[in-house]
C-alpha cells in the first residue's frame, strides 16, 4: 500500500499507510500519536452550544439601499442619501424549537439583519409577527419553557402552553396570530420582519421620535394551512432553507421594502394604547378600527444576493443583539427591549465566548485604520413634558404585567377583521388549528381555554369548543 501524507491542525505532516506516525511496539498508539489525540479532541469540541432560542436557521448576504429621503427624521449615516448602499447579512430562523426541528412547524419566525455601516454594525432583530407574547421580561424563561417538550418525557405537551396562555392573558393577541396561518408561513423569502419594539431616532439638536421599523416582503405572503405545513415538514424538514438557497442559485434575489412608523413623544400619551407595550402592534390601518393609524414611511430596500460559503463560520457564528446600535439610534424604555439589551450579548458570550465580536462574521467593516468618521457633537436629548414622563412611568409600575382591556381588544379586533383582511377560510383555519391543539389537553384544561377565549369573543370560544369536542369524541 502506498504511503500517504496528512496534515495535523498544527500544520505538521504525518506519513504512513494509516496516516499515523511510526509506532514503538511497546507503547499504545494513544501514548505516541499526538495527531490522533488532536483529531479526537477537535472532534469532541467542534460543536458549539446552540442558541437558547432561534436555534434553527439559514442566512444570506445582501445590501440595503436608501430609496427615499428621511433626513428630516433621522441622523443615521446609513439612511442619509438616496442611493446609498450598505452591505448586510440576514439570518432567518424558527424560534422555540431545536436546531434539527422542521422549519414548517407552527412557530414564530425570526429575521435578524446585521448592517455593516461606516459607524459600526447596526443589528435589526425582527420577528415575522409585529408583536410579542409578553411585556414583562421576567416571564420570558417560563414562556419559552412552556413551548418546549415536556421535561419528563421530552415529548410535546400542549397543556404546558395553554396553561401559560390562560394564566397570562397578554399573550392572546400573538396566540391568535400563532394559530392562524400566519403561524405556518414557512417560506423565508415571503415573510416580513417587524422590529416590534419602539426605538428612538435622535437628531443633532437633541430632539427625537419614537420609531418602529419593519420589512415588507416584495415576494408577497405565502401561507400554508396546518395540514399542508405538516406534510411539508414530513417530506422536507429543511424546506425553507432549501427554497432560499435554490432561489439565490437561480438568480432570483428576494427583496424587502423597508418602512418606518414614527410617533412624536408628546403624542404617545394621547394614543389609546401604550406603544411601549410590545404585545400590541402599531396600527397600519388594518385593525383596530377605532385606534389611530400610524402609517409606514418608506426608507429603502433590502435585497439578498448570495448564500454563505461556510455556514458554520458565516451564519452559525453570527451574534445579533438589539443593543448593537449606531449614532442616532437609541433604545426606548420598553421593558422587554431593555431586558434584551442584556440577554442577547450575555447569551452570545456563553455560546461563542467573550470575544465573539472579533469573529469574522461579527467584525465591523469600519475604516481600515480603525478611525471613526467625524460626527457632529449631538446636543443633550430634549426632555419631553411631565405628561410624557408620567406615561413612561407606567412601564415601571406594578400594574404593568396585569391584564388590561387592550389585552382583549386587540385579539378581538384581529378575529373580527380576519374575514375582511384574509377571507372566511383564513378565520376558519384559526379555529381548526386551535381545536387540534386544545383537543390534546385534559378536560379541565379545555374548559379553562374556552373561558379564556370567551374573553376575546363568544363566537370564537363556541367554535373552538364545538370543533375540539368533536375531535375528542
Swiss-Prot record:
UniProt KW keywords: Alkaloid metabolism, Heme, Hydrogen peroxide, Iron, Metal-binding, Oxidoreductase, Peroxidase
Basic and acidic residues bias (residue ranges): 366-377
Ligand binding (heme): 344
SMART domains per UniProt: Catalase (SM01060)
Any GO CC annotation of this UniProt entry: mitochondrion
GO molecular function, one term: metal ion binding
GO process annotations (BP): hydrogen peroxide catabolic process; indole alkaloid biosynthetic process; response to hydrogen peroxide
Pfam families membership: Catalase
Region entry Disordered, spans: 1-31, 352-389
Cofactor list: heme
Pathway assigned to this chain's UniProt record: Alkaloid biosynthesis; ergot alkaloid biosynthesis
Keyword Transcription included in the entry's annotation: no
Catalytic residues identified in the record: 54
SUPFAM superfamilies assigned to the protein according to its UniProt record, in alphabetical order: Heme-dependent catalase-like
Enzyme Commission designation: 1.11.-.-
Family that this chain belongs to: Belongs to the catalase family.
Record's protein name: Catalase easC
Organism of origin: Claviceps purpurea (strain 20.1)
The organism's taxonomic lineage, starting at the top: Eukaryota, Fungi, Dikarya, Ascomycota, Pezizomycotina
Gene name tied to this protein: easC
